[in-house]
Every structure is written in C-alpha cells, then in structure tokens.
Curated annotation (Swiss-Prot):
Source species of the chain: Saccharomyces cerevisiae (strain ATCC 204508 / S288c) (Baker's yeast)
Inactivation phenotype: Displays increased levels of spontaneous RAD52 foci in proliferating diploid cells.
UniProt protein name: Uncharacterized protein IRC9
Subcellular locations according to the entry: Membrane
Other remarks in the entry: Partially overlaps YAK1.
Length: 130
C-alpha cells in the first residue's frame, strides 16, 4: 500500500514538473510578443513607423520556440500536430518578417494576420500544457 502511494506521489511530482516547464516556456514566448505589441501600439499612437532594428524580436521568438520544442512533452505534442505546427510557426512569421522589413506592419490586413498568428500560438501552447 505504501509503494502505491509513493508511486502516485512520484507521478504527481512529474506531472507538476512538466506543467511548470510548459508554463515557463509559455511565459518566455509571451514576453517578446508583449514587447512587440506594446512597441507597435506606442509607435502607431505617435504616428511613427516601426524601424527595422525591432524586427529581431520576431526572430527571437522563433529561436525560443525552436529551442523549447526540444523538451519531450512539447516535441511529442507537436509531432502529432505537424500540420498545425507548419501553419502556425512557418508560414506566418516569415510573412510578418517580410512585412516588418517593409514597414507595413501597421497596415490593417497585416495586423489582422498578426492577431491570427498570436491566437494560433496561444492554441498551440494550450495544447502543449494539456
């Protein structure tokens, strides 16, 4: 009876650690997005265009996700959803990087696509944490 309780506690600890790891990755992924959105809003209120120097934020996001997917739970989830991974993390970021370089990110069409990209990131992170 004691071994079963110890095994159950051990399993709960492992589940908690995986959840904490996924939550930490979610926070790390969210920080560049918060900075990106805040800088976009501040610059659009001031009537200025976003400079090319701020585009590495998107590249940083992609690098962080690529590093983060090496975790077992995240890699397992993404390997089951290859099409979602390709749609979310391959098509949209390069489209935005191109738009960002041409200073078109404040265009309404580009901003709507950016919001769709954010929603897809949140959906993918939620699937990973569940």
């Amino acid at each position: 009876m004691t071994m079963q309780k110890a095994s159950k506690v051990n399993m709960e600890v492992r589940t908690t650690l995986v959840t904490m790891q996924a939550t930490t990755m979610s926070i790390i992924l969210a920080l560049p997005l918060v900075v990106l959105i805040a800088s976009t809003l501040v610059l659009s209120v001031k009537g200025r265009r976003i400079h090319l120097a701020t585009s590495p934020i998107i590249l940083l996001l992609l690098i962080l996700f690529k590093k983060g997917q090496q975790a077992r739970s995240i890699n397992f989830t993404l390997s089951k959803n290859k099409s979602l991974f390709c749609l979310t993390f391959l098509n949209y970021p390069f489209h935005f990087i191109t738009a960002w370089c041409h200073n078109d990110i404040l265009n309404k069409y580009e901003f709507c696509l950016f919001l769709i990209f954010l929603i897809r990131i949140v959906i993918t992170i939620n699937k990973v944490t569940l």
